[in-house]
Amino acid sequence: MYINDKEKVIKLTQELISTKSYSGEEDKMVEVLKKAFNEFGFDDYHVDDYGNIVGRIKGNRPGKKLLFDAHIDTVEVPEPDKWSVEPFEGKIIENKVYGRGASDMKGALASMICAASEFAKQTNRDFPGEIFVTGVVHEECFEGVAAREISAR
């Protein structure tokens, strides 16, 4: 099983990078993720009291839950003029994407969303249980606090 269209992963990664989401300022990122969950065929999503977003894909039989967890905040860019690329562009140079959050952890989040969607599509949802993809807030400044809200569910 593999992702058939890597361009989807790249484009989503670039969209996530281009959305500023400093700790405490993740609202725009949550809106981007709502749109992505809809476009990638997730059954639904939920935004909790902390601002975490949880997307869900249901299999066609009861079973266990699988969680892909990512944080959606980044540290600030104190001196953007010292960057060799625009921090919020998602520029591709020699097959690598650059920008704030590219490796921590917007690229991984895009991969999680695309992989979950592709798995559901390729299996025709013939799997037991549910797949969740989370976008957790405030990780850079309060690691684990907002994530505990998701764990409690």
Over which residues does each language-model region extend?
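Short, conserved acidic/polar surface loops in the N-terminal third of protein domains
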Residues: 77-81, 102, 144-146
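Acidic/His- and Gly-rich active-site-bordering loop/insert found
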Residues: 1-98, 121-127
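Short glycine/serine-rich loop segments
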Residues: 98-100, 133
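Acidic/histidine-rich catalytic neighborhood of metal-dependent amide-processing enzymes
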Residues: 105-153
